[in-house]
Amino acid sequence: MAVATSVATPVPTPAYSAGRAPAKEKKIYLPDTLAEWPWPRAINPHYAEAKEESQAWAASFNAFSPKAQHAFNRCDFNLLASLAYPLATKHGCRSGCDLMNLFFVIDEYSDIAPVEEVRQQKDIVMDALRNPHKPRPEGEWVGGEVARQFWALTITNASAQSQKHFIETFDEYLDSVVQQAEDRSESRIRDIQSYIDVRRNTIGAKPSFALLELDMDLPDEVLAHPTIQSLSLATIDMLCLGNDIVSYNLEQARGDASHNIITIVMNELNLDVNGAMRWVGDFHKQLEKQFFEAFNNLPKWGNAELDAQIAVYCDGLGNWVRANDQWSFESERYFGARGLEIMETKTLAMMPIQRTEALGPQLVDDSIL
């Protein structure tokens, strides 16, 4: 489900001019981005069963140390999938869980790997996805087998169109992961617009949206329609902003916040952390308007079945925004055991920098680096 880069999301005019704060800022105030978002929390009824299966499956690869695997499990990426695909079948829910686990295996390994190694990881994963029934070479990086098994199970009950869209967009996602590694190796901090252009792919939203259409047959021209494109792009950008807002504190503590909109805005507009948070909150409001302008004017194709599928698909995009936000606070990924409290107060303490080169998520101050 490729989203054309010709559909532009305007970057808002700077509204804040406060100078950069001292390096050790006491409190971070999160913007309440979804205060008026109409999609309520919904969860797939197969969550518990799919989580048990997918968590055991992910652990079976021994991709992380036991300590890191424990922290990984506390992130509960299966919850994210079950919130994101509340209407999916048991098979669809399991595929969603497996995909989220695959994403984070790729993320954790690529975050600490040199650029050339990340390129090799990309080639391994794409070869596995394109050849899901071909055994992986002995001694190969574990991500190849994780990807192969995920896709071999998923395609047993997936339409040809959804498979096509997934492969295309996962390739784009991995290209952006390589680009992120290049930026990191060069200590490059992008400007706002070029960062957004890259972040739209590193978030992994496009292949995630392909799982919304596993039981649909959406033609390419439907997904390429300007209104659907605008809707998809607004959704992706809201997911990017939402994720960067909640992950910033941990990323800056890890010394790896260069690929985060908060850092980008602070650097370009000379704002402190909370000035950047407010700026991003205002940007999010613009994206909400873009989303609803498209959502309330969906095209009709004169085919009742296709129109119904489009309606369900687009409703799924709106739900994805809520799902990502809920998971961010309900899991222990970003806020440890204090997620629900922080969801209410929107306030947290700035963590001190605690760099780690260890592979996999690490427990620090009851949160997960």
From Swiss-Prot:
Residues annotated to bind Mg(2+) 2: D107
Name of the top EC class for this enzyme: lyase
Keywords in alphabetical order: Calcium, Cobalt, Lyase, Magnesium, Manganese, Metal-binding, Nickel
Domain of life: Eukaryota
InterPro entries xrefs: Isoprenoid_synthase_dom_sf (IPR008949), Terpene_cyclase-like_2 (IPR034686)
Entry binding sites for Mg(2+) 1: D107
SUPFAM superfamilies, sorted: Terpenoid synthases
Free-text activity regulation comment from the record: Ca(2+) switches the cyclization mechanism of delta(6)-protoilludene synthase from 1,11 to 1,10 cyclization which leads to the production of beta-elemene.
Cystine crosslinks: none
GO biological process, one term: isoprenoid biosynthetic process
Domain notes: The 2 conserved active-site motifs D(D/E)XX(D/E) and NSE are required for coordinating the divalent metal ions that stabilize the PPi moiety of the substrate.
Record's protein name: Delta(6)-protoilludene synthase STEHIDRAFT_73029
Organism (species): Stereum hirsutum (strain FP-91666)
